[in-house]
């Protein structure tokens, strides 16, 4: 793997309320926040997204976002991407914006590949640095080999050994723990290592300004 550039945590409403300034002081560089899940519906917005976004920005943390996807075909993956774009409108992000694909493990590689491409391409058409999140075996067994070359990968492998399911240069972020501890947050926290200088790259390309 490449050198670690940033220490990141990922968040959803389940992390509750906390002080982002304390989080930053503990050595965390950035956060990736869940926007919501599925196709557009009022109850499918993460009710901490706005609060977390404002708190992280005010604390000077780098911010990214992810949308939890339930789609089982490409047409619905596009609808989920459209929902995400509505939720991030008017915001800017220093880290990529991701589709989170964990519910599609029983589908074929062809269908999974088509869905990831449809979701990410929809985001890219709006000026996003788009990526895909999933567990390591999903990348290995359910996605075509060109996906890691085309989109940045955020790979979950909660072991001491970095993921080898995609080429090392394609792993932008490695989620290495679901049971981390961070000052200012009660309970377990998802922990991530970021291997690319996304803030610099995204700023240079003038992306993620919605």
Show where each model-derived region lies:
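Substrate-binding cleft of extracellular glycoside hydrolase catalytic domains
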Residues: 1-120, 124-129
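Functionally critical loop-and-helix segments that line ligand-binding/catalytic clefts
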Residues: 1-15, 22-25, 144-210
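Short, solvent-exposed loop/turn segments at secondary-structure junctions
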Residues: 38, 104, 137-138, 160, ...
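Flexible, glycine-rich phosphate/dinucleotide-binding loops
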Residues: 40, 72, 139, 162, ...
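Intrinsically disordered, low-complexity segments enriched in small/polar residues
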Residues: 50, 64, 131-133, 174, ...
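Short beta-strand/turn micro-motifs composed of small residues
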Residues: 67, 134, 157
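Glycine-rich, charge-decorated loop segments at or immediately adjacent to ligand/cofactor-binding or catalytic sites
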Residues: 79, 138-148
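Aromatic-lined carbohydrate-recognition surfaces of secreted/lumenal glycan-active proteins
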Residues: 127-139
């Amino acid at each position: 793997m490449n050198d670690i550039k940033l220490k990141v945590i990922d968040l959803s409403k389940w992390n509750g309320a906390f002080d982002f300034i304390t989080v930053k002081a503990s050595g965390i560089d950035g956060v990736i926040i869940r926007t919501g899940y599925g196709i557009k519906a009022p109850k499918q917005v993460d009710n901490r997204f706005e609060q977390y976004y404002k708190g992280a920005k005010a604390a000077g943390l780098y911010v990214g976002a992810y949308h939890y996807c339930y789609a089982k075909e490409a047409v619905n993956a596009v609808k989920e991407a459209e929902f995400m774009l509505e939720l991030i409108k008017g915001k800017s992000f220093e880290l990529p914006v991701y589709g989170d694909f964990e519910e599609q493990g029983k589908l074929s590689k062809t269908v999974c590949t088509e869905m990831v491409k449809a979701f990410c391409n929809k985001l890219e058409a709006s000026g996003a640095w788009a990526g895909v999140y999933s567990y390591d075996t999903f990348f290995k067994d359910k996605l075509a080999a060109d996906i890691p070359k085309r989109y940045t990968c955020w790979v979950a492998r909660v072991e001491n050994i970095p993921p080898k399911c995609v080429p090392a240069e394609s792993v932008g972020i490695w989620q290495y723990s679901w049971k981390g501890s961070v000052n200012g947050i009660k309970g377990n926290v998802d922990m991530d290592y970021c291997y690319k200088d996304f803030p610099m790259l995204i700023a240079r390309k003038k992306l993620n300004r919605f």
